[in-house]
């Protein structure tokens, strides 16, 4: 009996010590809720349904009372404010270019960059998309890429929207920081505000009167596209530099009528020959010290 009592006391003391250690060091514990709970691990993982400020309930005057007439009014306005079709936004990065001189006017596409843009144009043509809008950054390399693509797709050049909001820049300080690229804080403030304005201009759910799915082609830049992807998917925007996309690659995002956003392609360039796959400026034509 004495041995049994000693064993029980020892077991109890051991369990108590283990439990106290768990309380002191909870971060080492693996909880079942990590994989099995309906609640997200981090509150930031919750989807913001009104991210574009067009969630129907945010646009309609709230119920003033519970009278049937008021409820009918509210439900009718709510239905009228709902989007009914999806928007597809296809983002294309410019082709490889020459980084020579201090002016954008000298940053022409390389011969390889022109071939990349041609392959992308052919790929977009093969997809058989009827484009509702084509938008291009006002920087030379994006303009040249857009011109080459337009020769392959069914869209009039005169209808292209040239947008300065899409110009390349520093959208937000990246995490983790990198040593080889450290813009001044003023550049992040200037470029970040502009690029965010570009995101808000082009990323939103469809208007309620849109009667068919729409397709918008945007020809822009690597930093801007990566930032747009993070913002659209509600990932931490500071993670944009962890993504890598090739020159003239295709990124396809879809905004559903509910406001949910999904990604179909991210930096797709598999339609190009291997010798055309690039993502950096050729060092022999790059402005380096």
Swiss-Prot record:
What is this entry's stated membrane topology? Single-pass membrane protein
Segments passing through the bilayer: 7-23
Q: Which InterPro entries match?
A: His_Pase_superF_clade-1, His_PPase_superfam, Mito_Ser/Thr_phosphatase
User: What Enzyme Commission number(s) apply to this enzyme?
Assistant: 3.1.3.16
What terms describe the molecular function in GO for this protein? kinase binding; phosphoprotein phosphatase activity; protein serine/threonine kinase activator activity; protein serine/threonine phosphatase activity
Statement: the UniProt record of this protein carries the keyword Cell cycle: no
Tell me where it resides: Mitochondrion outer membrane
Instruction: Show the catalytic activity.
Output: O-phospho-L-seryl-[protein] + H2O = L-seryl-[protein] + phosphate; O-phospho-L-threonyl-[protein] + H2O = L-threonyl-[protein] + phosphate
The chain's disulfide connectivity reads none
Which domain of life, per UniProt?
Answer: Eukaryota
In the UniProt record, which is one GO cellular component term?
mitochondrial outer membrane
Q: Tell me, which GO biological process terms does this entry list? A: positive regulation of mitochondrial fission; positive regulation of mitochondrial fusion; protein dephosphorylation; response to anesthetic; response to heat
Q: Which UniProt keywords apply?
A: Hydrolase, Membrane, Mitochondrion, Mitochondrion outer membrane, Transmembrane, Transmembrane helix
Q: What does this protein do?
A: Displays phosphatase activity for serine/threonine residues, and dephosphorylates and activates Pk92B kinase. Has apparently no phosphoglycerate mutase activity.
Per UniProt, subunit arrangement is: Interacts with Pk92B/ASK1.
Similarity comment: Belongs to the phosphoglycerate mutase family. BPG-dependent PGAM subfamily.
What is the protein name for this chain?
Serine/threonine-protein phosphatase Pgam5, mitochondrial
Taxonomic lineage of this organism?
Answer: Eukaryota, Metazoa, Ecdysozoa, Arthropoda, Hexapoda
């Amino acid at each position: 009996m004495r041995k049994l009592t000693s064993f029980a006391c020892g077991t109890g003391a051991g369990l108590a010590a283990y439990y106290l250690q768990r309380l002191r060091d909870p971060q080492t514990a693996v909880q079942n809720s990590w994989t099995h709970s309906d609640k997200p691990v981090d509150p930031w993982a919750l989807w913001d349904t009104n991210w574009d400020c067009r969630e129907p309930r945010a646009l309609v005057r709230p119920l003033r009372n519970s009278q049937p007439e008021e409820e009918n009014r509210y439900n009718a306005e709510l239905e009228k404010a709902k989007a009914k079709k999806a928007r597809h936004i296809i983002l294309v990065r410019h082709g490889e270019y020459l980084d020579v001189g201090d002016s954008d006017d000298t940053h022409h596409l390389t011969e390889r960059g022109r071939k990349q843009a041609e392959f992308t144009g052919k790929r977009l043509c093969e997809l058989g998309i009827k484009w509702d809008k084509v938008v291009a950054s006002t920087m030379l390399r994006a303009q040249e890429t857009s011109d080459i693509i337009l020769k392959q797709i069914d869209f009039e050049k005169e209808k292209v929207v040239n947008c300065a909001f899409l110009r390349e820049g520093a959208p937000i300080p990246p995490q983790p920081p990198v040593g080889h690229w450290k813009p001044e804080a003023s550049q992040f403030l200037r470029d970040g505000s502009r690029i965010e304005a570009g995101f808000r201009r082009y990323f939103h759910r469809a208007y309620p009167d849109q009667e068919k799915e729409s397709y918008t082609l945007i020809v822009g830049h690597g930093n801007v596209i990566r930032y747009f992807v993070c913002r659209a998917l509600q990932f931490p925007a500071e993670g944009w530099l962890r993504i890598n996309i090739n020159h003239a690659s295709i990124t396809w995002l879809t905004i559903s009528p509910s406001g949910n956003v999904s990604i179909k392609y991210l930096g797709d360039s598999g339609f190009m020959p291997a010798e055309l796959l690039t993502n950096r400026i050729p060092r022999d034509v790059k402005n380096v010290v």
